[in-house]
Amino acid sequence: NTNSAKGEGVISTFTISSDGTTITEVGSLEHDTDKGFWNSLVQVDSDTYALAYQGAGDDGFIATFTISSDGTTITEVDSLEHDTGKGSHNSLVQVDSDTYALAYAGTDDDGFISTFTIDSDGTITAVKTQSEGNNLEHDTSNGSHTSLVQVDSDTYALAYMNNTNSAKGEGVISTFTISSDGTTITEVASLEHDTDIALNTSLVQVDPDTYALAYTGTASDGFISTFTISSDGTTITEVGSLEHDTVRGFYNSLVQVDSDTYALAYDAGCCGTASISTFDIATSTPHQVGTVSTTS
């Protein structure tokens, strides 16, 4: 929020050395002078990127950019206001070569899934969106804190928070089939995995039918749970769960390190203490391996 109390939208590029000892900012573009919240960025091709974010009026936007391979030039190509009511808690994934699916919280924080086509030059076309009046409202109680991942060629798993039975917001994983052209979106199955609360979700695939979810649970503690999800999305089963931080586990970002090791970056303290922890996640209950120190 350099120039705006609301918080402008910015894309920046960095070079990071192979050993992690140097991190240098290369370029920066203020692409929205009003607001740029709840960002989800994906690569379209070698130099084109798509960003879902909440912009002016809290509306939902998709914008595309070309970014040079050295990061020195960042250029906005196209922009689409896909939801004129609200567009927060975005999670954008690629469906096929030019089709993309977006899970987000819309009006009244209800859960929506929309689809778009984005061609190699960055042109965006609405397929199933609120602006077209034809997207999927999959949860009418709440659909925030989303994390969407691909299960197979046309099946997707979405971790999110709803509040059907709890004012705090239970943890849910639902599956959907989405056609390769984005014209059909169908809910398949749903599992309420935490009856208390599940915020700040980050879902990753472990193997063809195993998934790991980092989230903020009871008492704001940090949890990692594992699930099996069938390739057609019809069965979702919780396998194991680990309460890895009994103080705080906010703003999670979980990534794979190798075949069974995962790193989690999260807010671990009352004053925004950043932490990185590693975990061994196989097909059973995950366990913590250690914490990661900064590179000097």
Predicted regions located by residue number:
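Extracellular, repeat-based ectodomains that mediate carbohydrate processing or recognition
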Residues: 1-296
